[in-house]
A protein has these predicted regions:
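Alpha-helical transmembrane bundles and membrane-interface segments of multipass inner-membrane proteins
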Residues: 1-214
Length: 214
């Protein structure tokens, strides 16, 4: 499979899953609704935030707009870099796959920010409507990002003997995220874990090219 095919399939499939899961949550749950699907530690918990990963916020209004604009600029540069890596014979398929995941993560949350405020009604105390007659809940570029995956694997009071945090409530994993967030995390993790392999291949090929052209 070519690097171009890997990139296209990764982007299309991951983006469809991201948006399908968000739209499903918006059209079937109210903000704050939750249900468990694996014991008590794997849950779908519907929340919306102003745009940062894992449920974190960057403020509303101007701050929200600037975050969206920054993401659009980042997507441009990631797309350009990815296209260069696809053309570069020295780059590995694994690196292209990881970059594609990072691009999906950025694009997925941009779609929420740009469009969701216009195409959905609000979800507070009600299930949202798609294309409401009265209009959406926010202006263009001011939509909220939909998060839903919640894994509170451990929740409890830490033992007193633990320095600084002993006796305090602790929750792991407390962040609520979506498929786009997961794509960014996995993409970055792949690059960090296999960076020596990815960039060693490029360095080796550079040396071979130099040796063959004295």
């Amino acid at each position: 499979m070519s690097k171009k095919t890997i990139a296209i399939l990764t982007i299309v499939i991951s983006l469809v899953i991201d948006q399908a899961s968000k739209i499903w949550v918006k059209l079937t749950m109210r903000s704050g609704d939750e249900f468990m699907y694996i014991g008590n530690w794997a849950r779908i918990h519907f929340v919306e935030n102003e745009g940062m990963a894992f449920g974190m916020s960057f403020g509303a209004g101007f701050g929200k707009l600037m975050l969206t604009v920054f993401r659009i600029i980042a997507v441009y540069f990631i797309t350009y870099y990815l296209s260069q890596q696809i053309k570069d014979k020295k780059s590995s398929k694994g690196f292209v796959f990881a970059l594609s995941l990072i691009l999906v993560g950025a694009v997925g949350n941009i779609i929420d920010s740009i469009f969701y405020g216009q195409i959905f009604s609000h979800s507070e105390g009600q299930i949202a409507t798609l294309f409401p007659a009265e209009g959406g809940y926010a202006k263009w570029f001011h939509g909220r990002v939909v998060d839903m995956f919640y894994f509170p694997i451990y929740r409890g009071i830490l033992p007193e003997w633990i320095p600084f945090f002993g006796g305090k409530f602790f929750e792991f994993f407390q962040f609520i995220f979506n498929v786009a967030d997961a794509c960014i995390t996995v993409g970055v993790a792949i690059i960090l874990l296999f960076q020596k392999q990815f960039f060693k291949e490029e360095a080796t090929q550079d040396i071979q090219a130099t040796s063959s052209n004295p």
